[in-house]
Amino acid sequence: MKPWKIIQKLESDNSRLFKESVIEENLNDLILQEGLSMCLDALVTFGVKQVPESKENGKGLNWETFKSSAILLIDRERTGHAARDEILDLMSLATSEQWNDWYRRILIKDLRCGV
């Protein structure tokens, strides 16, 4: 299952047992694990305050492309306008569902699903 679909599923119900079962089902998803790690690790910061929501659909953004750009932000190789431009480039590639429900939430460090 795609990570943003998993997040949407987690958002759909407030039950702790439901959330545990969804996470248990998808425990072996490496992309989900890496995304959760980036998002929930307090020592990982991206150095950006604002991450816009997407209203347009791109072709789709694969995880490796996002991850390599995120590492540039984490390592502070992209700061200021360069960081903003990097994020806008990523946003233009991703579908609005991918961006708003997965990649953007990692960058703002809030999955908004009660995990």
Q: Where are each of the predicted segments found?
A:
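N-terminal nucleic-acid-engaging modules of covalent nucleotidyltransferase systems
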Residues: M1-V115
